[in-house]
Structure formats: C-alpha cells, structure tokens
UniProtKB/Swiss-Prot annotation:
Similarity remark: Belongs to the universal ribosomal protein uS12 family.
Record-given protein name: Small ribosomal subunit protein uS12
A biological process term (GO) from this entry: translation
Organism: Xanthomonas oryzae pv. oryzae (strain KACC10331 / KXO85)
Binding partners and assembly: Part of the 30S ribosomal subunit. Contacts proteins S8 and S17. May interact with IF1 in the 30S initiation complex.
Higher taxonomy: Bacteria, Pseudomonadati, Pseudomonadota, Gammaproteobacteria, Lysobacterales
Length: 124
C-alpha cells in the first residue's frame, strides 16, 4: 500500500486505452483502395495460402487486410471497405475486408453464415 507522501510525489496513473485497430480512427469501418493483392503463409503450426490485400485508406494510412471466404474478385485499384478484427496466424494483419460491399463481391454459393460473407439468400 502506498503512503500519502508517495501519492503526493507521484499520483496514480489512469490506465490508457490502446486501440486494436488504430488506422480506423475510431470509425466502425473505413474505405480504401487496394495497392497490392497477394497470398501469404501463416505462422506455425498452420499451413495455407491466405489471401490478403494491402490497402491505402481514405485517411492515407496503409494497412494489410484479410480477404475471408472462398475465392474473391479483388485486384489492384479495387475499392474496398475495411473493418477491424485481426487474423491470429498472420502477423501484421489487423483488419478484415467486408465482403459484399463496394468492389468486393460476396462469396458465391454460400449457404450458411451468409451475412458474414455478403451472400444473398439462395432461391430454395
């Protein structure tokens, strides 16, 4: 327990909040232009070719964004919407692209969890 004298010398510090997605500037999503679309490999023990895009946001920040779902239509100069949310096995990837919005098409033939991939309801 600290003494009053110690608290007079150095007051208690309030814990500061550190954002997990600082490039969004406290916005829920942000628009950006793809500068490079490529695949990368995850950390051990996983193995795959994960689809990612380097995106220049409207606030001039460059971020790496994960493209979820099977298959995508993104290429350089595609305009995409970015949301927060990191990918645990890809270092440096702290954002997700929103499928079914702007130039990013929804996942074709998706039947379950459609809202996360921008897929329309199938005709029964």
């Amino acid at each position: 327990m600290t003494t009053i004298n110690q608290l007079v010398r150095k007051p208690r510090q309030a814990t500061t909040y550190k954002s997990a997605s600082p490039a969004l500037d406290k916005c829920p999503q942000r628009r950006g232009v793809c500068t490079r679309v490529y695949t990368t490999t995850p950390k051990k023990p996983n193995s795959a070719l994960r689809k990612v895009a380097k995106v220049r946001l409207t606030n001039q920040e460059e971020v790496i964004s994960y493209i979820g779902g099977e298959g995508h239509n993104l290429q350089e100069h595609s305009v995409v919407l970015i949301r927060g949310g990191r990918v645990k096995d890809l270092p440096g990837v702290r954002y997700h692209t929103v499928r079914g919005s702007l130039d990013a098409a929804g996942v074709a033939k998706r039947r379950q969890g459609r809202s996360k991939y921008g897929a329309k309801r199938p005709k029964s």
